[in-house]
Amino acid sequence: MLSNSSILITGGTGSFGNAFVPMTLKRFNPKRIVIFSRDEMKQWEMAKLYKDDPRIRFFIGDVRDKERLRRALDGIDFVVHAAATKIVPPAEYDPLSVLKPM
């Protein structure tokens, strides 16, 4: 199902993305995998691992930014939503800090 498809993974530089991307490349032959995350440093580090693989693309953005997400979804067949807030207590104390109206 994922072979020859375009996949967007939100939060793609996190622990799930770092496991999902190599597994997907090994088990399937996707047309492209777009790593969508807001962490430029983690994207840079991950890009070094896949510098010779033209199927891997990187897209800086936040899932709370509707227009940026819409641009990232262009031509995408499947979405794996792995974006999350890692530090939960501050979000529980101030839920509005992690929300953005769309």
Where are these regions (language model features)?
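A short, basic/flexible loop-to-alpha-helix module at the beginning of a structural domain
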Residues: 1-5, 87
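N-terminal Rossmann NAD(P)H-binding glycine-rich loop of SDR-like oxidoreductase domains
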Residues: 5-27
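SDR active-site strand-loop-helix element
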Residues: 10, 36, 79-83
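Glycine/Thr-rich phosphate-binding loops of Rossmann-like dinucleotide-binding domains
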Residues: 17, 43, 88-89
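Conserved glycine-rich Rossmann-like NAD(P)H-binding loop of the short-chain dehydrogenase/reductase
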Residues: 28-42
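Short alpha-helix adjacent to the SAM-binding motif of class I
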Residues: 42-49
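NAD(P)H-binding glycine-rich loop region in Rossmannoid oxidoreductase-like domains
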Residues: 50-100
